[in-house]
Design a protein with these regions (language model features):
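Conserved helicase ATPase core of P-loop NTP-dependent helicases/translocases
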Residues: 117, 135-141, 160, 309-312, ...
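Conserved segment of the helicase C-terminal RecA-like domain
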Residues: 376-381, 385-415
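Conserved interdomain linker/interface between the two RecA-like ATPase lobes of SF2 helicase motors
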Residues: 220-299
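Conserved helix-turn-beta segment of the N-terminal RecA-like "Helicase ATP-binding" lobe
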Residues: 114-137
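Conserved helicase/translocase motor-coupling segment
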Residues: 265-339
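Long, largely alpha-helical accessory region at the distal end of helicase-like NTP-driven motors
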Residues: 26-50, 288, 413-523
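Post-DEXD/H (motif II) to motif III coupling segment of the RecA-like Helicase ATP-binding lobe
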Residues: 179-241
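ATP-dependent helicase/translocase motor core
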Residues: 1-82, 86-104, 121-125
Length: 523
């Protein structure tokens, strides 16, 4: 039955094309390109790269935004692994075709050299031009700036606006656009006036509350979020286990950016028996939840270099061959580490500040979250490292270590981002066993871990400011009409959670969802 159901889902999927004998040569070329993609392989630049159906849907929506609404600044939200860069390259190719004979100058902006290099190779492949574009980042210096892949750091340090007029670039792509609310991007976004601005991101939501949507008429032109991507079999399913952590983070220093990383690192590495007990929990949980440790190809996300090194040594001492990498590791070290992991020589790479954005090891089948991740963007990027499809890979196993957290730590958004049904609150999902997980996915919380999360979420309703904030965003979050009954039902609240502070109408007025009013009896 399972085989028949799987076949039926593939047969009816729009992601597959009908095959006939006259397409044999095209299939052979495509399979070869998929297997042997190499930026130095000239044959790559002779292949026709066509969009998948979901990518074509996004391209069509972009065209509609521009032709019907006349919006030339557009944001595409696409889950890690769905080919955001390919979409931008295909869109640029269409732009060039529509403006044949014109320069069609391109500026592609990102904040990491790895992203820029991969993006340049992608554009060259889509355009079938091995000489297209140049890098301006690190040690790379371009001969021409007409088609430029530029880091935001170089843009600012080189005073790039002095070299170019506001309308010099016809088409500008800003990758990982969630960074664009930062001060470093403001000069670029305010100075240039391109014919087309395209923003790309997997998660437009920022933990500091600053929105990037005003750059795009407060609209998302097209999106394919993580649950939809899994449902459409563009990413592999996951089994997520929330493991009860042995350490209490409730007393650690908290600032605007989250936990103090130094205190976290010391707790995880220098606290003697506490650190060893936690590391032992990680190993025992791994052995409990994975089917075969010898088949594991894993990444462990750590808070510091010391933490990554500590976990690496602990795993090796337990007979689980591992290495660690940091943001300072060279390209050669990273490539060698990837090869050793894929070949099975090692089981884990413990990392700090890498494998978040723009780096892929599709074979990864296990991810360990060994530190609290305050940023939803980073959480989804790190999760996405393991969601790539790969041969003989059935699913991704995720172990997230959950302890008592600061009341300001946001568990809710993290779990909401994993669920297909946005009309049910996270509290209800926890109580019902995460029935809205994407197809083929499974979320399980250990008993104490579930209690820590529920207590944390409920605490966020424990003051008037928290209630006002949730009322203000209720319709957007839930898709429901804002009524007292809907609010209580969605958040699984007792009415006393509201009325111990104020009336529901007064909270709505403070949230600007209704007009202010005067009620003498309130006194």
């Amino acid at each position: 039955d399972k085989i028949a159901a799987t076949f039926e889902s593939y047969w009816n999927s729009s992601e597959f094309e009908y095959y006939s004998e006259d397409q044999k040569e095209r299939l052979a070329r495509a399979l070869k390109a998929e297997k042997y993609f190499d930026s130095n392989n000239a044959e790559v630049y002779t292949m026709d790269i066509t969009p998948y159906s979901y990518q074509q849907e996004i391209l069509d929506k972009l065209e509609a935004e521009r032709t019907i609404r006349r919006y030339t600044r557009n944001l595409v939200v696409a889950a890690t692994g769905t080919g955001k860069t390919v979409i931008s390259a295909l869109d640029y190719k269409r732009f060039c075709k529509q403006n044949s004979g014109k320069p069609c100058r391109l500026l592609f902006v990102a904040h990491r050299e790895e992203i820029l290099r991969q993006s340049l190779y992608t554009f060259r492949a889509v355009l079938k031009d091995a000489n297209f574009g140049e890098l301006f980042v690190g040690n790379y210096r371009p001969e021409s700036i007409d088609h430029l892949f530029l880091s935001i750091q170089t843009f600012n340090s080189q005073d790039f606006t002095a070299k170019t007029a506001p309308d010099f670039y016809d088409y500008i792509v800003v990758d990982e656009f969630h960074h664009a609310a930062a001060p470093t991007y403001q000069k670029l976004l305010s100075y240039y006036q391109p014919k087309i601005l395209l923003g790309l991101t997997a998660t437009p939501e920022r933990m500091d509350g600053k929105s990037v949507l005003p750059y795009f008429n407060n609209r998302i032109a097209a999106e394919i979020r993580l649950p939809e991507a899994i449902d459409r079999k563009l990413l592999c399913p996951f089994q997520y286990f929330g493991v009860t952590d042995t350490v209490d983070l409730n007393t650690l220093k908290w600032s605007a950016g989250g936990y103090d990383k130094g205190e976290l690192s010391n707790l995880y590495t220098l606290s003697g028996a506490v650190a060893n007990r936690r590391a032992d929990l990680v190993v025992s949980s791994l052995l409990k939840y994975v089917t075969d440790i010898d088949e594991v190809k894993g990444l462990g996300f750590c808070v510091s270099i010391e933490h990554a090194e500590f976990m690496c040594h602990y795993f090796n001492d337990c007979g689980i061959p591992s290495i660690f990498l940091t943001g300072k590791s060279s390209d050669e070290e990273r490539k060698a580490a990837k090869g050793r992991l894929v070949s099975g020589e090692i089981r884990f790479i413990f990392v700090v500040d890498i494998y978040n954005e723009g780096v892929d090891i599709p074979e990864v089948n296990t991810v360990l979250f060994l530190r609290p991740t305050e940023s939803l963007t980073i959480f989804l990027q790190q999760l996405g490292r393991g969601l790539r499809l790969a041969e003989d890979k059935e699913c991704l196993t995720v172990l997230d270590f959950i302890g008592q957290a600061n009341k300001k730590y946001n568990f809710e958004d993290k779990f909401a981002a994993l669920l297909s049904n946005t009309t049910r609150s996270v509290i209800r999902e926890i109580k019902d066993g995460f029935v809205s997980a994407p197809k083929g996915c499974y979320i399980q919380l250990e008993k104490k871990a579930a209690k820590y999360i529920l207590d944390n979420i409920r605490a966020s309703y424990g003051n008037t400011a928290g209630l006002v904030s949730r009322v203000a965003s209720f319709t957007e979050d839930s898709g429901l009409e804002l009524t007292l009954a809907n609010f209580l039902d969605y958040y699984h609240l007792d009415p006393r959670a509201i009325y111990k502070f104020s009336s529901f109408s007064r909270i709505c007025a403070r949230a600007d969802t209704i007009a202010d009013f005067s009620e003498p009896l309130e006194e």
